[in-house]
């Protein structure tokens, strides 16, 4: 027997525990000054359903907040605003866009560019610089006041005074001021106040709008824009620097091939060809100080020969009426001589009032149009100066390089690449002046429109959703799928079946197709957005804004043509009786796999399975009998086909 314990001495702990349990179970508590968790002086949490809530929709979050607000619940509930997911696109609704357009038309007269203050020879450089700063500051305050009072959004215009000073100098020294605009949206890049400022400086100066990238427009679209500007009394010229460069390069290659084929004919022909090649070099190296009168005469003869060659081009075939007018006029001038042509130009008043033509002009036609536009007194005697101005990335430098015949001006896809104006002599008496690109103040609905128009750099954008949403709104779903060969997810059953795809749907499909993935295995939407937006700016995804009064959907002839070509291709493919070979795509992985010289099967375990031995392939009867020889079976001498791990054998296939 063990030692007997004192009665009640060891049960004190159990008594305390039992008392605490009974106290917690009892509902009759006496008031106490002790601070315990059982005080009934707070909110009764027991009546609530304590269910964890980690995610709430916007509506549930609002209703929960309104319920917590108590007395303000009714007032807040009356102001409920349902925000659909499409609101994140950053685009305006139809009603908002119409309202903003009306405000733009009402306040368009307040948009202006800064003027250079009046100066004369007595004005010192310091006084002129201070006056320019004062006028520039006043101009900026006027635009800020317009934004604050009218609640309008202006484009992020140029705020560097030095760029505007270069524009002033280009306008002052130019006889013809050419605004280069993008053919896909000419009204966005056109500045009407710039035309007024040119006339304010000198009424003899001429304004011309050069619609670049006009090869992206169809003939019907060019006619519509020509008629629109004709009604407004503005001279326009349709031009494509890229298409003309390709055309000139093709002609030069044909000339080189023809010269190489006729090189062995006679020595006299070789000497004449050498004489014709020298003026072409003078075209590239021409300057005002180094050329003599003899070289000028040779240059003019060469240019006349090139004009005759150009008139035999396919321009007459594409537009016979206009080709007869242009070509016939030039031939008459060549036949009757320069004196008759000058008399004809003085006699006909049509040269001062030119009608807008919708055909694409060539390099020589463009230079001839410049010479015909300005016939009055020039800023510099004996020299016609043509100033090229406009927004960034509309093709000013590309136009100069095409006219000059080689790379005279640096070109970049990034807007604002040209930093300083420069003058270049095309021929004696004709000078081109390139001005840096200026973002002039204009009304805009959203910043996404400026990114899609190429005004703002794509690589510097912060939010990719609004511009991609604008692309989805302008380009139909079927055109996007046909262009990239992707399948965009269809709208749900409770959605509009004809709604445009969202930016997330397009970027997800494009990213999966191109393999643009993030570190977490999701499609890289920002990277895909940069590719799609650059295709939109380049014209691969083509959308052309119509003139005022035209239906934007009916104006997109290229979309219908693309879809018709796709439907015709599918019909030809599905025609019975025509077996077309399936297009075989050469895959490097498949080609390497099926051309292996050593192919073997691997099995698990150490025993041979159906004639196969691990690591050695098929086991023959002779080899099996040789292995069963008496001796030391545990010795495996010369075992070169021992079992190896599969991950070592095929580690070259691991990615």
UniProtKB/Swiss-Prot annotation:
Single GO MF descriptor: GTP binding
Entry-linked PANTHER family: LARGE SUBUNIT GTPASE 1 HOMOLOG, LARGE SUBUNIT GTPASE 1 HOMOLOG-RELATED
Function per UniProt: Functions as a GTPase. May act by mediating the release of NMD3 from the 60S ribosomal subunit after export into the cytoplasm during the 60S ribosomal subunit maturation.
Residue ranges, compositional bias (Polar residues): 344-359
Basic and acidic residues compositional bias, start-end: 328-339
Record's keyword terms, sorted: Cytoplasm, Endoplasmic reticulum, GTP-binding, Hydrolase, Nucleotide-binding, Nucleus, Phosphoprotein, Protein transport, Transport
Name of the molecule in the record: Large subunit GTPase 1 homolog
Sequence ranges assigned to domain CP-type G in this UniProt record: 164-441
Binding positions for GTP per the UniProt entry: 212-215, 390-397, 434-437
Natural source organism: Rattus norvegicus
